[in-house]
Every structure is written in structure tokens, then in C-alpha cells.
Amino acid sequence: MDIPVNAAKPGRRRYLTLVMIFITVVICYVDRANLAVASAHIQEEFGITKAEMGYVFSAFAWLYTLCQIPGGWFLDRVGSRVTYFIAIFGWSVATLFQGFATGLMSLIGLRAITGIFEAPAFPTNNRMVTSWFPEHERASAVGFYTSGQFVGLAFLTPLLIWIQEMLSWHWVFIVTGGIGIIWSLIWFKVYQPPRLTKGISKAELDYIRDGGGLVDGDAPVKKEARQPLTAKDWKLVFHRKLIGVYLGQFAVASTLWFFLTWFPNYLTQEKGITALKAGFMTTVPFLAAFVGVLLSGWVADLLVRKGFSLGFARKTPIICGLLISTCIMGANYTNDPMMIMCLMALAFFGNGFASITWSLVSSLAPMRLIGLTGGVFNFAGGLGGITVPLVVGYLAQGYGFAPALVYISAVALIGALSYILLVGDVKRVG
């Protein structure tokens, strides 16, 4: 595509918005990971079994997934500023209260509430990037904010462990929840849609708009202009192209949730690696994924600047990343810890490289239904978060981890094929 050239220098106000999204993603994922950090101490204090702890872990994923579509609908009605303020404030309060939980049921309830309020997060990110960035910069923007999830997991988990050891597990939730509450107030004070933002130049607005950015797409819909959803709207949301993207997101999320849930157990129980060594080995794949997601956005936008079509530039990193992720099953054929770590790091690098899937949602979704489409997209990812812990657990219990890794590889392959066979040309639906 042609990159617009303006006589006036466009300015860089949009990058402040991108940094704000990145910080929010870091907070979002730290508030997901804090329970894993504190789980052993919680089990000991409350006498919770591993099976019961499984219910606590899954409470987030179930409600997070179920609220994706309602969250997207709400986003389309009120816009990003209000949606994200309510979401960040809500999940942060629920996180803080987890530090005062009194037992199993209160933990389950509070984790479920956390999932409800986190549901609109990534549809909101997608809507903002669509409004703030031209097409040829969008993949890099998505890659940058998506990397926040790996920063939170790879770099901040040791800090949470230190807080727990210095104080108690309660403070893991109090600190992370308190930071989120403060950030929600900063967000509401600072963020505005592009046209309402102070300090943004007309040249930058023109640059974004001329490059395909929807500079008016992040404003809340006026009450009198709101339209009820119709059967035609739902048909557009489940267009063949978008179904291909949804399947791809299920595949990307499936690999991610294997690493979030079963990877440490795989190392210690299946491969007999010591807990200390496994702790180091779990960090390496997250760092590899962090590199992968940053590199994918850069590669996608570079291809656009080199004259390749938008569809080719966006789909190539996703397809390649999903195919690379299939190498995870190679760990079935070695017991060497270094080789296992390399294969797992390569697979998770591929997962990170494929994680710019959101950039295609912003290019394919019907303009009036970006939030709803993002909700369905994230719903598909949430299904991966629900099914992988269950399927891998069942396979590992009955047959060992080898068929579980084959399952993860097969899902990644299906995801790659969905982009090749279903998505086709990247053109906005409707």
C-alpha cells in the first residue's frame, strides 16, 4: 500500500497512547500470574487441595471467556476511555480483595470477578490501535503492547516472589491491586480519543487518517445513534475470513496456556528436572516469546514498507509463527535438558511471533462492530485457555505428556492452515 506523505511532520503523540496500552497489558498479566505465585502458600494456609486449587485457577478463565462478547458490545457503546477505566478499576479492586480472602469460595468468587473485568481488555487495545495508528504502523504497535504480557510474566514474577517472601502472600495481591487502582485513575485522567486529545497536531491526525487509521472510531456512540444488533451483523462477525482468524487465535492461545499452566509440571514430573533448574528453564521460553512478538511486528511493517500487500505482511509472521510452534512435540524425542529448553524456547518464540493476530482483527472487522468482533476473537482465545489445562491434564494423567505435546502441535498446525485456507485477502468485511 502507499504510505501517506504529509508536508508537515506528523508528530508522535500516538506513541504515548501506545505506552499507556503497554503498561495496562503488563498490569493485566501480572494480575493473572499473581495467583500462581501465591498458590502454594494459599493452599497451606487454607488447607486447599490441588483439585480445589484447580477450581480457583479456572474461575478466571471461565468468566473471562463468557464475558468477551458482552464486553465487546459494551466497548462499541461507550468507547475505550470509559470501558478501560471501569475494567482496570474493577479487576484491580477484585485483585486487592484477594489479599483478604478467607477461604476457597471467596477466592473463587474474586478470581471470577477479575476475569469479568479483564474481559474487555484486548478488544479495547485493538480498538485504540485501530484509531491511533495507520495501517503500515499497526502491526508494530500490536507487537509492542502484546509484548507486555511476556514482560509481566518473565520479569515481574520474581518481584512478586520477593514480596511474598519478605511480607506474605496477601501482599502480592494488595500491591498489584493497589497499583492497578492508581493506574485506572491516571488512565481516566489522561486518555482521550484522537480528536479530543490535547497536544495532537492536525498533521498527525491527517497522517493517521490518510494511512487507514479510524481517528473517529474510538469515540463513544451517541445514544440516539446506537443501533441494535441484527442477524446481518452477526453474519458479518462470523464471516469466513473472521472464522479463520478466530481459529488462529484459539491455536495461539492454546500454546500460550500450556506454558502458563503445565510447563513447570512437565519439566519436573515428565523429564525429572529439579525444581531449581526448572525455575530457570521456565524463564527462557518467556524471554524468547518476548523477542518473537517484538520481531513479528517489526517484520510485518517492514514488509508493508517494502511494497508487499497488507495481507501478506500481516499473515506471514502469524503463519510462520504457528508452524514454528509445532516443534514443541520434538521434546518427546529427547531427555537432554538443554535440548528440551531450546525446543520449548523455539516453540514459544513461534507463539510470540504469531501473536500479532490482533492486527488482522483491526483490518478485517466491520467498522461498526470492531469491539464485538474483538470480543468474539478473544472468546476463541479464552476457549484455548479453558480447554488446554483440561485436555493436557487428562492426556498427561492417562498417557503421559507425549500425546499432550502432539495435541498442542496439531492445534498450532490447524491454526496455520486456517490463515492459509480461510482468511484469504485482507479486506474489511462488510
Curated annotation (Swiss-Prot):
Keyword tags: Cell inner membrane, Cell membrane, Membrane, Symport, Transmembrane, Transmembrane helix, Transport
Membrane topology: Multi-pass membrane protein
Cellular compartments per GO CC: plasma membrane
Topological region Cytoplasmic: 1-17, 75-81, 126-141, 191-241, 298-314, 355-373, 424-430
Sample GO molecular function, one term: D-galactonate transmembrane transporter activity
Presence of keyword RNA-binding: no
Subcellular location: Cell inner membrane
Protein name: D-galactonate transporter
Originating organism: Escherichia coli (strain K12)
Organism placement in taxonomy: Bacteria, Pseudomonadati, Pseudomonadota, Gammaproteobacteria, Enterobacterales
